[in-house]
Amino acid sequence: GYSEEENRADPQALADMLQVIYACSKPTVARVQGDCYAGGMGLVAACDIAVAAEGIEFCLSEVKLGLIPATIAPYVMRAMGERAAHRYFLTAERFSAQEALRIGFVHELVSGDELDAAVARLTHHLTAGSPHAHDECKRLLREIGGETIDAALIADTARRIGEIRVSPQGREG
C-alpha cells in the first residue's frame, strides 16, 4: 500500500508534468506509434499537435480498474470534447485511431512507416514561425478557449495583435 503522502505525490507528479507540457512556450508534437491508454492519453492531449499511426487503439481504461482519469481529464476533455469524454471516460471502451481523428483527439493519421516524415513535416512548419509568436499564440489559445465572444474578448484580442505587431519580432516578420 501507499502512505497518504505517497498516494498524493504520485498523481501530483503526473499533474505537474502534464502542466509543464501544456504550458510549454514552444509548440509540442505528440508522435503516437503504438496503442495509447490512460496516462498516455494525457500526454498526447497535453501536446499542441498529435500525429498517430493508423491501426493503433486508444483507451481511457481507468474505470475498469476502479479509478477515474482525474489527472488527465482537463487535457483529454479539451482535446476530444466533452461529449466524447463522457462516452470514453465512462465506458472505458477501446477506440480506433480513425475514431480519435474523427473526435479531434489526434490531428493526423499516417501509416507507421510515414510517422517520422509526418512529424518532420510538421516541425518544419513550426520552425518557420517566430518563437515569440508561438508563445503568444499558445497563451491566446489557453486564455480564450471556451470564452464567450463578447465586447471584452474582442477588445482583448485586438489589444493582443496590437501589442505583438509593434514587438521587435512582429516588426521583423
Across the structure, where does each feature detected by a protein language model lie?
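Short helix- or helix-capping micro-motifs
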Residues: 84-93
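Terminal peptide-recognition signature
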Residues: 27, 44, 100, 137, ...
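C-terminal long alpha-helix characteristic of the crotonase
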Residues: 51-56, 106-154
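Glycine- (often His-adjacent) and acidic-residue-rich active-site loop
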Residues: 1-20, 36, 148-149
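Functionally critical, cavity-lining and gating residues within the transmembrane helices
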Residues: 37-38, 69, 82, 170
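Glycine-rich beta-to-alpha active-site loop
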Residues: 18-65, 94
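Short alpha-helical scaffolding segments that buttress acidic/His motifs in well-ordered protein cores
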Residues: 88-89, 137-141, 161
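Hydrophobic, secondary-structure "cap" segments at the distal end of domains
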Residues: 74-83
